[in-house]
Structures are given as structure tokens and as C-alpha cells.
């Protein structure tokens, strides 16, 4: 509850001015320092360092030069010229020559107010611009015909409170001639959205919210479609993390490639980068913190293809290429982190698709940001981002002459889904029978389309049927719809159906839908009466343990929420018997909500698991969540049990014995190295040019693994360097080592917060919610503090990297080159 506001007094103002003066003094110290650059001609990765599929030729048309910025988005205008969005601010035009084998750079006037241009699209005689850090979508028009876009209008403000690039992203023209806007998870829905948008009424639907996710709102990444003027905003689908682009195939089906949270690797809520078939009303299950939905939730749609680690950027289908048919049908996906473009083959499977991927081309570095097929049928792509070197490339087919494209037809299942989707925004009371028939369709994607259609119809037109029909998949699907959009008064009827339900006769996978319906109903409307709770417990208690992890997941949560007397013992059994750390973390997370029934034996069994699991590996947050669980378990035990286990808690609170490479002896300074000393040699280095053993010795001598991670070794304090050679060339790697503050990933910058009580809190922001920020104040221990947004008087992001200057001054020239060669490989 917020404090009442009182008028400021004279002393308040003096205190505030004193705090602010102190803050400015600190900032002056923090921000001091300069960076230097070399004026030599800059060179993007040469084509001979790029490996493409047989039959394709890669050309480098232009490398960005000093003053041209880093390029992150692109589109072709009607004249065949390329317009690019710049990483920092502004737009530019790349003019191809007649042979399409070179390009000149021309900045566009009066576009500096467009900050961090993540998306550009030429359509409807306009240039649409997604300026993420300007927090708006713009429509630019060139009425004078001089190519300078004198008209620049904001068509939608989209407030964005993060520095991490999860704002407005790319835009694409859809087959319906509408503009599709791709938005990451740090942006709220626009106020002008259509109230009948297919994606609506979404909630977190967490049965057991984690206290460590407190303050998170229900923002999710989404895809909107807008009319040319930007007046109508329809939310098509949502539940994404940070999908950057969308693309449409020859059937008009939409696809996106969503980003992962690599810090979650090793935890049950980790979701790899994933290709999603995006359909009307699609819910894809991303939520904040530990609340990300698993792929199998009945109220969300599964991934079409998991693609592991990576950093998704541009997407494009080959339908506008002049390449062979298998490439015209393929989806091409750019991976900024791993320096590659994937080729995805999609095969119709009912109302959706199966997918398999292969590497189309890759290089090192090749941080691909965006790509488009040009008027000549060749693929053009740009590299860049985060201030890195940019290049414009062209990929052409060199094989046999091409046959004419093969016409394709739509599939019956997709046509049925499309028919159901017409009712996602349209009331059709006379079509309830048609919708109902498809609620039980064996195809998940058709069932989903039917449920969204049902939810859009007046509830009075189908509620009675949902409650009175005999049991079937259609009825169970309708009850999920009722749990989602019905009133609290409707839920008693849902519970009446669930009580006495023949659970034991259902296969494990068939239990997921009714179990999840119970969860959604309770999450949205609260617990049923005590009598109903007891009847549900009698039905559900015998079902656990099950051989299926997903069934156990839902059952355990429900039994904890319903306060089962047996769930404590059963949960500890599951915890001890599970073979994967992901399953164990999920069972432990749910078990930490059980506050009664603990004795010394059960507490010791959990302590034993904590002792074992503290060595589990994965992303940065594995250790964080282990520590949260330790604290949660300790807090729910009685004071007497805490006293009996005091020695165990003390032992668990001590750091593990050092497992990383030992710190090297202090070495004498060899030289205060500068970029000019080494840039020529570093720029010529090729991956694996020097031996791995030499590089490993240099890595140890520089103590890199004290803060960084390579493979399974090292720390998570700084960026993971495993694939850094896919993003940065030798020159860029040298720059980041010699001058670490020249370009820093915002995730790793410290921020200085002046609080209303005069405190100065400095550290790295590791958690963001609507009301609070979590600040890591000590990167070596992981210690954090939570601050309230309303208490922040001022904040200034640091510009200096936490990585000190001069770390390689104790290395010889050859050792530094060995280190760079290792990182490039």
C-alpha cells in the first residue's frame, strides 16, 4: 500500500537537494573516462570465411565505415534501394550499383530522433519504423519525392521500460495487406487495441505463485496487426518472450522464432529458442520468472521446433527467391549469437506443420540482424548490433537453371482451422453447433481454434451445453473455456463435474486437460467450498505418483493448494526418485509451498537434497533458484526444527570448494597495450590458427574464467564467451579486451539509483517487475537487494564496464594473440 502524500517541507527540499548533489558528484566520477578508436578502414567478415550450402555464392557488398553506425534492420523500397535502421539512432539508405555487387551509404536527413531502429518496412507508399528506444511506431512519407521523408508521424506510442531490447521489433506486410508489428515482453498492449482481438483475456494463471516472482505483471510478447494509418490495432497472438520477426509462407501461415532465457538452462521452466506457428488467438505460454508455462499445457500451443541456444533475429521465406523449389518453400532464420542462417523445411501435419532445420550458411563472426530477398531474387542480409561491425551481403544461386515455381494448395485441416478462426472476432450464434463439433477434434490446433471461437461467443449461448453434455473431449475443452471467461458463480458447476470424475480410467495424458482446467478455475476465481475441496482431494490423492512427469506436475500443485495431508511425503519421494535436475527443481519448488506436517526426518531428507543439488549445473539462475529454495525451506520450518538443523543450514550457506581454475600467480606488467599495438595482427587471425593449448594457457594467465564462462567452465558474472567468435572478429575481440567499456551489453552494466531516503544503490539489474527492481550489488556472491520503483528519485546507467582495463597488460603479444585465436575458434 502506497504511503499518503504530504506537501514537501523546506527541510524535505534541502534534504532532496543535498541527496541529488551527492548523486551528481558520484555520477561525475562514474561517468568520467574516454574511449579511443582507430580510423583505419573497417572490414566486415570476408566471404571466404563464410560457409554456404553447395550451389550458393556469398558476396560482401559493403562494410560499414566509421560514422556509419551499426546496422540492425532493413527493407527494400520500390526503387530496389535498401533502407536500414541503425543501432544507435537514425536511418540510412544503401544504394546498390547496376550489377548489385556494391553499395554506397547515404544517411537519411532528420531521422536522428528515431532511436534504436529495430524494424523498418516499406509498404503503402510509406516507411514504417519501429524505433524501440523512442518508444513508438512511426509512419514516414516522402510527399516531395526527394527520398528524405519530410512527413514523420507517430502512429502509436508503446512505452518501454527496459534497456535490454525486448521492446518493439520488426514489422512485416501480411498477405491481407495489413502491417504486422512484432513486440517483445517489456511493452504493454496499446490503449487503442481492438477489444475483440483474438488474443485477449490472458492471465498468468499461476496456481502457486512464487514469492520470488512477486511484482511481475502479465506483460507478454505479442504480435499485432494494424491498418496502414495505424488506427486499428488487433492483437493476433501472444505469450512470447522476445520474438524479433515474423514471416508468412505461401499459404499465408505466419511463423516466428522466439528467444530463450539462457540463464534458465537446467531449470524446469527453461524454454529453448523455438519456432512457433502463429495462429489466430494463439497462446504460447511465456510468462515472467519461474512462471513460464511448459510446452504441454492444454491452454497453450506447443513449439513447432525447438532450436536450442541462439539469438533469433530476422526471418524470411524463400518464396520470392529465384532459387530451386526446396529453397522457395523453406523458411530462413538468422541467428545473431551463433553466426548462422538456418534453413527450415516445413511439412504439413494436420492444421499445422512439422519442421526440421539445417545450417544454410555460417561464418565467424556473422552476427546476422536482418535479411530480405531483393528484386533480383537474391538474399540480402546485414550484420551488426550492439555497436559491432556491420556488412551487407548478397547470396545468389549458381547452379542449374530453375524450373517454374510449383503451385501449392491449402490443406483440408488448415481450411477447417481458418473457418473456425473467422469466429474469433465475429459473433455467430447459429454456428455454435459447428464450433462444438470441433472442440473434440483429434487435432490440437483445430481444438484450440474452436475453443477461442467458443470463448468469443456470448456465454449464454453455450454455457448450459458445456455443463449438461455427457463427458467427452469437447465437453472438457468447453469447461476450460468456461474456467477462463466465466464468472465466479460458474465455477461451482465445473467443480461438480470434476468431483466423482472417473480419473482412474483416463490415461495420464488425458488427465492433463481436466487437471489444468481445475488449476485455471482456482487461479482465476479462488478455491471452492471446503466440502468440494475434500471431495476433490479424495479423487486426486490416489493418482500421485504417476509415471508421467507432466501429470505429477499438475497433481502435486493441486494437492498442495488443496492442503492434502499426504502431499508432503509423496513430494519428497518424487524429489528423491526423479533422475533429472529439472524434475527435481520443479518438485522442490512446489514442495516449498507446504508449510505444515514437517518433522525432523522430512526436513533432513530435503537438506540432503539441497546438499546434492547445489552442484547442479546450468545457467546463471540455477544457483540463484537453489539459494531461494534453501531459504524458502528454512523459513517454513518451525523454530525447533531450525535449531536442530542449524549446523546443516550453516554448512549449506558456505560457498562450495573452489571448482574453477585456480587464480594465477601475480605476473609483472609486460606493457600497457593499446589497440594500435595489436590490431593489425589480431585482424589477420583466423579461427584455430593457433593451438588450443596456447590459448588455454593465456586464458588462465588472464584469469578470464573468474568472471566469464566458456563451455562448462567458469563463472556467470560476465557474458558467456563460448560462441563469442561467431559475433566478433579479431579486431572487435581485441577492442573489447583492451577497452572493455567501448561497447557493453546493457545486461552487464551497473546502474546507480538514488533513493528517496538518500541511499545510493549501485549494481546490475537482474530482475524487473512492474513495481520493483532486483539489483545484484555484489557479482561475486550474487547478493541482491530489492528496491521499489516509486522510491527511485533518479537513476543513471553506468558507461564503464565492470571489467577493469589493463587485464592483459601482464600478457605478452603472443599470449594475447593466442587468447584471441582461442575465442575466435
Stretches with model-predicted labels:
Residues 1-20:
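N-terminal secretory signal peptides that target proteins for export/translocation
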Residues 368, 376, 385, 582, ...:
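C-terminal structured "cap/appendage" subdomains that terminate the fold
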Residues 372-377, 443-445, 516, 557-564, ...:
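C-terminal substrate/ligand-recognition segments
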Residues 39-423, 662-663, 667, 679, ...:
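Beta-propeller domains with acidic blade repeats across secreted/periplasmic ectodomains
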Residues 22-34:
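Bacterial N-terminal signal peptides
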Residues 142, 228, 459, 523, ...:
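Sec-exported extracytoplasmic/periplasmic mature domains
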Residues 384, 388, 397-698, 717, ...:
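Long, ordered, helix-rich scaffold segments
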Residues 378, 697-712, 720-723, 729-739, ...:
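C-type cytochrome heme c attachment motif
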Amino acid at each position: 500500500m502506497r504511503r499518503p502524500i504530504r506537501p514537501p517541507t523546506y527541510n524535505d527540499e534541502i534534504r532532496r537537494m543535498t541527496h541529488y548533489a551527492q548523486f551528481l558528484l558520484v555520477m561525475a566520477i562514474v561517468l568520467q573516462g574516454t574511449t579511443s578508436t582507430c580510423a583505419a578502414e573497417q572490414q566486415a567478415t570476408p566471404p571466404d570465411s563464410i560457409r554456404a550450402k553447395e550451389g550458393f555464392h556469398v558476396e560482401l557488398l559493403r562494410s560499414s565505415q566509421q560514422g556509419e553506425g551499426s546496422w540492425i534492420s532493413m527493407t527494400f523500397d520500390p526503387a530496389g534501394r535498401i533502407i536500414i535502421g541503425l543501432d544507435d539512432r537514425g536511418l540510412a539508405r544503401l544504394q546498390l550499383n547496376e550489377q548489385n555487387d556494391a553499395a554506397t551509404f547515404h544517411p537519411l536527413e532528420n531521422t536522428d530522433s528515431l532511436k534504436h531502429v529495430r524494424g523498418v518496412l516499406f509498404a503503402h507508399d510509406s516507411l514504417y519504423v519501429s524505433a524501440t528506444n523512442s518508444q513508438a511506431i512511426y509512419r514516414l512519407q516522402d510527399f516531395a519525392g526527394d527520398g528524405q521523408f519530410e512527413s514523420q508521424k507517430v502512429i502509436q506510442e508503446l512505452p518501454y521500460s527496459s534497456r535490454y531490447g525486448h521492446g518493439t521489433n520488426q514489422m512485416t506486410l501480411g498477405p491481407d495487406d495489413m502491417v504486422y508489428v512484432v513486440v517483445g515482453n517489456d511493452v504493454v498492449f496499446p490503449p487503442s487495441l481492438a477489444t475483440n482481438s483474438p488474443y485477449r483475456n490472458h492471465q498468468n494463471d499461476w496456481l502457486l505463485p512464487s514469492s520470488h516472482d512477486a511484482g511481475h505483471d502479465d506483460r507478454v510478447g505479442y504480435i499485432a496487426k494494424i491498418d496502414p494509418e495505424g488506427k486499428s490495432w488487433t492483437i493476433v497472438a501472444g505469450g512470447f518472450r522476445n520474438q524479433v520477426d515474423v514471416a508468412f509462407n505461401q499459404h499465408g501461415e505466419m511463423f516466428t522464432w522466439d528467444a530463450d532465457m539462457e540463464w534458465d538452462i537446467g531449470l524446469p521452466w527453461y524454454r529453448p529458442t523455438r519456432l512457433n506457428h502463429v495462429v489466430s488467438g494463439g497462446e504460447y505460454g511465456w510468462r515472467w520468472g519461474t512462471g513460464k508455462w511448459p510446452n504441454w499445457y492444454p491452454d497453450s500451443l506447443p513449439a513447432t521446433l525447438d532450436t536450442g541456444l541462439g539469438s533469433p533475429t530476422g526471418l524470411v521465406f524463400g518464396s520470392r527467391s529465384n532459387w530451386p523449389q526446396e529453397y522457395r518453400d523453406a523458411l530462413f532464420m538468422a541467428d545473431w549469437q551463433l553466426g548462422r542462417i538456418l534453413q527450415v523445411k516445413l511439412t504439413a501435419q494436420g492444421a499445422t506443420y512439422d519442421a526440421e532445420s539445417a545450417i544454410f550458411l555460417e561464418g565467424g563472426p556473422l552476427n546476422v540482424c536482418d535479411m530480405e530477398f531483393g528484386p533480383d531474387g537474391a538474399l540480402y542480409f546485414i550484420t551488426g548490433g550492439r555497436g559491432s561491425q556491420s556488412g551487407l551481403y548478397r547470396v545468389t544461386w549458381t547452379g542449374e537453371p530453375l524450373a517454374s515455381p510449383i503451385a501449392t494448395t491449402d490443406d483440408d485441416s488448415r481450411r477447417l482451422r481458418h473457418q473456425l478462426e473467422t469466429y474469433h472476432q465475429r459473433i455467430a450464434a447459429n454456428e455454435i453447433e459447428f464450433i462444438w463439433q470441433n472442440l473434440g477434434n483429434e487435432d490440437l490446433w483445430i481444438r484450440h481454434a474452436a475453443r477461442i471461437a467458443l470463448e468469443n461467443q456470448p456465454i449464454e449461448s453455450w454455457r448450459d451445453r458445456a455443463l449438461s453434455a455427457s463427458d467427452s473431449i469437447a465437453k472438457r475443452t468447453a469447461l476450460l473455456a468456461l474456467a477462463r471467461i466465466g464468472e465466479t458463480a460458474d465455477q461451482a458447476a465445473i467443480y461438480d463435474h470434476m468431483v466423482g470424475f472417473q480419473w482412474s480410467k483416463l490415461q495420464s495424458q488425458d488427465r492433463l486437460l481436466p487437471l489444468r482446467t481445475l488449476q485455471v478455475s482456482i487461479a482465476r476465481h479462488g478455491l471452492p467450498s471446503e466440502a468440494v475441496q475434500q471431495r476433490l482431494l479424495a479423487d486426486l490423492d490416489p493418482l500421485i505418483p504417476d509415471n508421467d512427469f507432466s501429470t505429477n506436475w499438475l497433481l502435486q500443485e493441486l494437492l498442495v493448494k488443496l492442503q492434502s495431508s499426504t502431499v508432503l511425503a509423496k513430494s519428497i519421494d518424487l524429489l528423491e526418485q526423479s533422475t533429472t535436475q529439472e524434475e527435481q527443481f520443479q518438485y522442490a519448488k512446489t514442495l516449498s509451498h507446504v508449510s505444515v506436517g514437517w518433522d525432523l526426518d522430512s526436513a533432513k531428507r530435503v537438506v540432503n537434497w539441497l546438499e546434492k543439488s547445489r552442484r547442479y549445473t546450468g545457467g546463471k539462475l540455477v544457483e540463484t533458484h537453489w539459494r531461494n529454495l534453501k531459504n524458502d525451506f528454512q523459513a517454513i520450518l518451525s523454530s525447533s526444527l531450525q535449531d536442530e538443523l542449524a549446523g546443516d543450514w550453516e554448512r549449506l550457506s558456505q560457498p562450495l570448494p573452489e571448482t574453477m581454475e585456480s587464480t594465477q600467480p601475480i605476473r609483472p606488467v609486460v606493457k600497457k597495450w593499446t589497440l594500435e599495438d595489436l590490431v593489425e595482427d589480431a585482424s589477420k587471425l583466423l579461427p584455430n590458427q593457433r593451438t588450443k593449448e596456447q590459448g588455454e594457457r593465456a586464458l588462465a594467465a588472464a584469469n578470464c574464467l573468474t568472471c566469464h564462462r566458456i563451455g562448462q567452465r567458469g563463472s556467470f558474472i560476465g557474458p558467456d564467451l563460448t560462441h563469442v567468435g561467431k559475433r566478433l572478429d579479431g579486431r572487435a575481440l581485441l577492442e573489447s579486451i583492451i577497452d572493455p567499456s567501448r561497447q557493453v551489453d546493457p545486461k552487464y552494466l551497473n546502474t546507480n539509483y538514488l533513493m528517496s531516503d538518500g541511499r545510493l544503490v549501485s549494481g546490475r539489474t537482474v530482475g524487473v517487475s512492474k513495481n520493483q527492481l532486483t539489483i545484484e550489488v555484489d557479482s561475486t556472491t550474487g547478493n541482491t537487494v530489492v528496491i521499489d520503483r516509486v522510491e527511485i528519485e533518479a537513476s543513471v546507467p553506468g558507461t564503464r564496464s565492470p571489467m577493469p582495463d589493463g587485464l592483459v597488460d601482464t600478457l605478452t603479444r603472443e599470449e594475447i594473440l593466442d587468447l584471441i585465436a582461442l575465442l575466435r575458434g
